[in-house]
Amino acid sequence: LDVDAAVSVDRPVFVNYETSVFYSPSLGGVNSSLNRYVDFNIWGICAVGSSVYVMATYKVMPSYIYLSQTTFSLGNPTILQFYDSPVSLKVNRNSLLAGSKSCDCLYYTCEDGIYYWDLKKQLSTTPVISIPVGMEITSLSMNPDGTLLYVGLHEKEGTEALKGHLYVYDVKTSTLISQYHNIADKPVAIIYKERA
């Protein structure tokens, strides 16, 4: 496969940004989105449950934002939103995305914070979570129920030996529930583990 990036989930999705094609492994080989997105620039892909959500812009008119949903078989997408936006799309190819099936939403990162997307609406134009000054978001994930958002942060100029922090938010309200400071060097993945 000729791909530029992979979306890290239980079932990975691989993206070729130049051709606007993405792939998903299957028992018989690899599923492909074929030419279904050829008219769009893909900026973000997020798997939530058995669905794959795509955030893109229309190549001919980049102010038009295209939001769609498909399955891992990558069949014909369902268009969720296709609209002319007064502001440019905030998500970029370096954005981290995490989705919740139970809350029908996605969170994604940008330079100025973390944004919330209610899957039934257009994208938000302002962040719902601000990042503390001097911190960089290094990880974004959710617990298995999709009710808690885990944000891994790195404080590059911090004075402690361990510069990594974990902030936990309520997915429905974007409210900070708890925070753990100086728990790792640089959090790259936060995984929820059930206690036995």
PLM segments and residue spans:
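A short beta-strand motif characteristic of beta-propeller blades
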Residues: 1, 28-37, 75-88, 123-132, ...
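Repeated scaffold domains used in trafficking and secretory/extracellular systems
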Residues: 1-10, 37-49, 82-101, 134-142, ...
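Long, acidic/polar, low-complexity amphipathic helices and coiled-coil-like
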Residues: 1-30
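Hydrophobic beta-strand positions that form the internal "hydrophobic ladder"
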Residues: 12-13, 52, 106, 149
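Recurrent small/Gly-Pro-centered beta-turn motifs in extracellular repeat architectures
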Residues: 14-17, 55-58, 110, 151-155
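Structural motif
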Residues: 18-24, 60-70, 111-118, 157-168
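Intrinsically disordered, low-complexity segments enriched in Gly and acidic/Ser/Thr residues
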Residues: 78-162
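Blade-level signature of beta-propeller repeat domains, shared across WD40, Kelch, NHL, RCC1
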Residues: 161-196
